[in-house]
Amino acid sequence: MKPTENSTGSAYPHPLDAILLAGTDTNARRLIKGQNKAFLELGGVALVRRVVEALIQADSIGQVFVVGPKLELEVVLSGLPSEVVVVEQAGQMLGNTWAAIHAAESRYFARHGVHDPDRPMLFTSCDLPLISARAVDDFVNRCAVEDDKVEHNYAILGGVAVEASLKSYYPRYGWDGILRPYVHFKNGLARLANIYVGRPRKLAHQDFLQTGFSYRKAKDWHNVVLLTWSFFKQAGGFRAAWLTIRYQATLMASRRGGWLYR
């Protein structure tokens, strides 16, 4: 049973609905041997089920809405509690997200008789093999603390992993490992952690989300050009395109010990 009162010490009075993205990518090159990564198995358990189990064990989470290929998801998620709701995918990432949001909003309205556009939700992806209920609760609590500091709650708060927390997964001593691209800040390197708390009804420029996701591998110059050009074609996109160009130029200049700066 999920608590109806806040037992986590956060500013959120009730558990959050979670939106879990497990859609099959329309770009075949992003599939893994032709397969949706949600269904890859680790220790005999599909990745998507691992994430769902962590979410339903978290005190900060109420219902879990999983969006993706419904028939396949219902098979790998069979036997889980009624708090888990499977939603048929609608297309690209943004369309899938809204399909799950609409399902969550409809269920909330059926139970409470009102809509609440300020209600926060948790958003995450299906490919987080190391996720745990404790980590989810910690993240939600941190977001609640940040929300509590401001007069108007944030539209979205994103999880960030700093380089120091990921170094133990680097290849070393002849073992295989994982190397991922980072965003370069003045005080260090960091990357988004594919987990967010947001209020989707308050989020502006949502087309930017799909554009950024489609061309997110910004270390590839082909994607950088496509990303910049796509921003130019969207309302309000000139500033986003200009910041993208500046960031890429700065990153290029910082390589090889920053010799271009000297």
Where are these regions (language model features)?
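Short phosphate-binding loop-to-helix
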Residues: 78-120, 130-131, 137-138
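Alpha-helix termini
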Residues: 7-9, 56, 104-117, 143-152
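Short catalytic helix/loop segments, enriched in acidic residues and glycine
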Residues: 34-52
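Conserved core of the sugar-phosphate nucleotidyltransferase
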Residues: 132-262
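N-terminal nucleotide-binding beta1-loop-alpha1 segment
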Residues: 1-34
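Short, polar loop motifs at secondary-structure junctions
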Residues: 68-73
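Active-site acidic Asp-centered loop
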Residues: 124-126
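Short, acidic, metal-binding catalytic loop of nucleotide-sugar glycosyltransferases
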Residues: 54-61
